Amino acid sequence: MRVVILGSGVVGVASAWYLNQAGHEVTVIDREPGAALETSAANAGQISPGYAAPWAAPGVPLKAIKWMFQRHAPLVVRLDGTQFQLKWMWQMLRNCDTSHYMENKGRMVRLAEYSRDCLKALRAETNIQYEGRQGGTLQLFRTEQQYENATRDIAVLEDAGVPYQLLESSRLAEVEPALAEVAHKLTGGLQLPNDETGDCQLFTQNLARMAEQAGVKFRFNTPVDQLLCDGEQIYGVKCGDEVIKADAYVMAFGSYSTAMLKGIVDIPVYPLKGYSLTIPIAQEDGAPVSTILDETYKIAITRFDNRMRVGGMAEIVGFNTELLQPRRETLEMVVRDLYPRGGHVEQATFWTGLRPMTPDGTPVVGRTRFKNLWLNTGHGTLGWTMACGSGQLLSDLLSGRTPAIPYEDLSVARYSRGFTPSRPGHLHGAHS
């Protein structure tokens, strides 16, 4: 089957790889001159299935009000003048109760755990390089309340079969030795030993090269104007004067998916702006071993070979890609506070990107009401964590194979009235 994939970020390229491996003739279209040059370029670098959780959580509405008056707030909201933003925020607020949070986190962990398994298999099969580490992730708490709240997430982890350690502050240095110097600032941490890290852009570009060698065609420098539809199917992609035709089409445009699908399929995917710093390592024993997550500021610090990636925060501000100095100062403050000897912060590269976020935090993966239009978008801050699993899942569905995990509640149909998916007995389904 001829398949066109729109988007060459980590999700689009992973989709191309798995569809190619399933025997399809795949073409990837992107406006950029190469793969992973937008949202996948400089994300936080963590592959953290156990920490897969929606921003829509109990307590967030009240916290958001407090954050309005804080210099280093993890979440910022500025109205962009669109009805879509207001509708999206209202939908997000409706997902902030405990029941929705547990349901949304459960299916996010299910997909993320499966994705980590798919990445592991891909690594074993291809020996793909991306400065990866398998050292786990450590979530750091600065207050007793945060430490106590961890028990809520532990219930989901136990249901999904995810190993964990809840550590008091005196034990944090057992997994991240450099934290011994700052343990007095912390109340404890939640460590997930099976989590991984890696450079998402490096992974995506290497996978794109492998996919191209396997027969995938990449059409870079090719802006897409619109999808052409006729009745119940898509019959082409208009790119300037050219119409590119296929048997099936996959939307993986991230935050730009919503606009491209306007008038065809309604999806609640909104850009969530984030920032990162890439910092050269200064002192090896003062740098992280793997990934830490600062629960207070919602910032991750991830170790690559000779660099640290400090990333996080969320701004609901529309398609604004301006690099704001106060956000850089927040990232610098956190890394200096936790790893004062770790990196040459003054040499850091500052970056921003737009994560495609749904109001419930779960991506949209699966077929639409159009029989040949498929979606793989809306992964929010977890595109790197979920890319391989989403790509494999999409490939299975498009190829008519039964996926390894429950998938009905990942489709766009979940936003329809009266949608009741068959519930898996275990959050992670077929994971072993």
Swiss-Prot record:
Record-level Gene Ontology MF annotations: D-amino-acid dehydrogenase activity
Which Gene Ontology biological process is one annotated for this entry?
D-alanine catabolic process
Q: Which family does it belong to?
A: Belongs to the DadA oxidoreductase family.
Gene Ontology CC terms, in alphabetical order? cytoplasm; plasma membrane
The answer on whether this UniProt entry bears the keyword Oxidoreductase reads yes
Catalysed reactions listed for this entry: a D-alpha-amino acid + A + H2O = a 2-oxocarboxylate + AH2 + NH4(+)
Q: What is its EC number?
A: 1.4.99.-
Q: Which organism does this sequence originate in?
A: Shigella dysenteriae serotype 1 (strain Sd197)
**Pathway stated in the Swiss-Prot or TrEMBL entry:** Amino-acid degradation; D-alanine degradation; NH(3) and pyruvate from D-alanine: step 1/1
Q: Which sites bind FAD?
A: 3-17
The cross-references to Pfam families, in alphabetical order and at most eight, read:
DAO
Gene behind this protein:
dadA
Required cofactor(s): FAD
Q: What is this protein called?
A: D-amino acid dehydrogenase
Q: What does this protein do?
A: Oxidative deamination of D-amino acids.
InterPro entries this protein is in? DadA, FAD-dep_OxRdtase, FAD/NAD-bd_sf
Keywords, sorted A to Z: FAD, Flavoprotein, Oxidoreductase
